[in-house]
C-alpha cells in the first residue's frame, strides 16, 4: 500500500488466509517523488506547485507533453523520471525485506501507478495485480466489510 508518505507491505500465506509478516515504512511514499522534483524545479527557478508537479509526473513518459520551456525540457524530464526511479528502487528494497520471492503482488494505494512497471519487471515470476481504484481500494474494502454485516 503506497501512499503519500508511507509504504505498508504484508506477506500473506496460504489462500489469503493469514498474514505472516507486516512492515511499515514511514519514509517511503510518493512525497519522495514530489520533494525531489520540487528541489530540482526550485534550483531551475521554475514553478514548484503541487499541481504543476502532478502534471509533470502524469506526463513523465511523454517529454513533448511537459509544459516547460524548450531549453529546460530535457532537464525537467530527466529529473522527474529520476525521482520516480528513486521511489521505485526504495519500494523494491522494502518489499524484498518482507518477501524476496512473492507469488502474488497486489498493488494498492494512490502511488501504485508510479511503481507498477518496476514491480512487474523486478518480480517477473510473480503475478502482479493492480487492484481496481487503488487509491481508495483499502478504504472501500473496509467500508464493504463493515456495512455488509
Please give the residue ranges for each predicted region.
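Short helix/strand-bridging catalytic loops that position acidic/His residues to coordinate divalent metals
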Residues: 15-28, 125-128
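Conserved acidic E/D residue at the C-terminus of a beta-strand in Rossmann-like folds
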Residues: 1, 24, 132-133
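Helical "lid/coupling" subdomains associated with nucleotide-phosphate turnover
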Residues: 11, 32-46, 50-149
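Gly/Thr-rich phosphate-binding beta-strand-loop-beta motif of the actin/hexokinase/Hsp70
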Residues: 1-16, 37
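Aspartyl protease active-site motif detector
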Residues: 3, 27, 31
Amino acid at each position: 500500500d503506497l501512499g503519500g508518505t508511507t509504504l505498508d507491505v504484508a506477506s500473506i500465506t496460504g489462500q489469503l488466509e493469514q498474514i505472516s509478516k507486516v512492515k511499515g515504512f514511514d519514509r517511503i511514499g510518493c512525497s519522495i517523488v514530489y520533494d525531489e522534483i520540487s528541489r530540482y524545479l526550485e534550483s531551475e527557478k521554475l514553478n514548484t506547485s503541487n499541481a504543476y508537479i502532478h502534471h509533470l509526473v502524469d506526463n513523465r513518459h511523454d517529454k513533448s507533453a511537459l509544459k516547460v520551456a524548450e531549453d529546460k525540457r530535457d532537464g525537467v524530464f530527466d529529473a522527474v523520471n529520476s525521482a520516480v526511479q528513486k521511489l521505485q528502487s526504495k519500494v523494491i528494497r522494502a518489499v524484498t525485506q518482507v518477501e524476496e520471492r512473492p507469488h502474488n503482488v497486489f498493488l494498492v494505494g494512490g502511488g501504485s501507478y508510479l511503481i507498477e512497471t518496476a514491480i512487474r519487471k523486478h518480480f517477473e515470476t510473480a503475478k502482479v495485480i493492480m487492484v481496481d481504484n487503488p487509491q481508495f481500494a483499502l478504504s472501500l474494502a473496509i467500508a464493504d466489510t463493515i456495512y455488509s454485516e
